[in-house]
Amino acid sequence: VAVYHEGYLYAYSSRFLTCVDMATGKAMWKSRQPGDGFLILVDGHLVILTKEGSLHVAEANPSGYQEVARLDLFSDLSWTHPSFADGSIFVRSMGELARVDVRAGAVIPTAEAEAEEAPAEGVFQAFLNDVKAATHKKEVVDRFMAAQSEFPVIEGENLVHFLYRGEAGDMAIGGDMIGARQEESMTRIEGTDLFYYSTELQSDARVSYLFFRDYKDELLDPLNSKTARSTMWGADMELQVRGTEKQLSWLAMPHWKHPSHLDPPPDGLPRGRVETHELRSDIFGLTHSIAVYIPAGYDTSVDRYPTIYLHAGSDALERGEWTNSLDNLIQRTVEPLIVVFIDIGVGDIFIPRDDYGEVWAKEIVPFIDSTYRTNPVADARANAGSGDGAYDALYCAFKYPELSSRIAIQSLHMGDFGRERIEPLVQTADEHPLKIYMEWGIYDMRSPQEGWDMRENSRNLADWLLGRGYDVVAREVPDGTGWPSWKNRNDAVLQSLFPIGWND
């Protein structure tokens, strides 16, 4: 809700506090401080409670954000406007209430008074000290940048410094290591055009990220040539479901290992092929596509093959490099198999969950079994998926237990409502034996300021399924979200479902 004071509106635009001239409609300023939150106007001052639980008082001034006081109040999420009455500010978090009395002349620390957290002692901190002491700062920056063999700059096994050099009034960074719908400010080195953001990651981590310039421009890291494609991140680092593709920069820490199964198969290695089919669905009255991977040797064999139904399959084919993984792993660590890439409900087509499951069970599975030499038993069928495709896989597996008894899911996107739909379908391992592989990233999709965390949802579901006796392998991996992450473990998914000799 906006507030008005002396010809100007003050409000949040996305996550940024903004001042707008009512006469011209021009934005006078934007500020990342004090963080996303809720504001009221009291006696010419903005009183703001942030979602992280801090209380701020700033002048309502069109020249810029000028904080006069702050107080860290709550450790849990706050999601309501402050109130003011009888000289006191009243605020609440999800679990607590507080009254803050306003007193003239009270000394309350401001953001500017707090010491800025510096990077840990090391090469980069020494560089910062050198720049601070130098008369000719540009020369010190030039030498440091020229001495680097790669960017971002990694110190030791865990410390990483993201750098941006160029003209900007404000720079920020967003990505897997930070979470959805938020960025972290980058610090300008005074007297230079170099900005930095320092953090610690696991020594074998891989994360995707973007830079944000002057609140509007999304930038790849111009110093880092590693890029990836993802449909998980929308504008302003919003979570999106199979949305528009976005290019991201990515970083690997020193102990991360490139998955060789993603490489193009070597010359001479037998390769499978992908066939496409257009299926008319009588259940929802539309035509949809499926793609089917057929392993090398299928045409000269009389064998029947296990089948994986990969939900949200078009993304897996386009960005998940599944065909490379299949060609490289089959007959080595993975049994020869058929993979069906399902593409229902992509784009603007919304398919109710019950209809989706029915299409899979009553139309797709019978079509595949009648078209290809599948092994048509539950133990030879698997559901798999990543992100929202993981929820589709989970739903189909538990809704139709007679059709499949294996499942592999990555980064399950399932909130409380989704879990309420799944839990009534779940029986026990005695009633419905099911082999389950689950994984999620340490830096997976989450929004701390909105109180949701897909990592925690996955942990809770894994524990719940284990409690009901299911065979669950659950892994938390040092990676982020989207296909830049998931594809790195195509091998783990395949080997969890149908390893060589699975049916011996």
Model-identified regions with their sequence ranges:
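Noncatalytic, solvent-exposed loop/strand surfaces
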Residues: 1-111
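Short beta-strand segments
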Residues: 27, 69, 98, 171, ...
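Non-catalytic cap/lid and distal C-terminal segments of serine-dependent acyl enzymes
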Residues: 115-182, 189-504
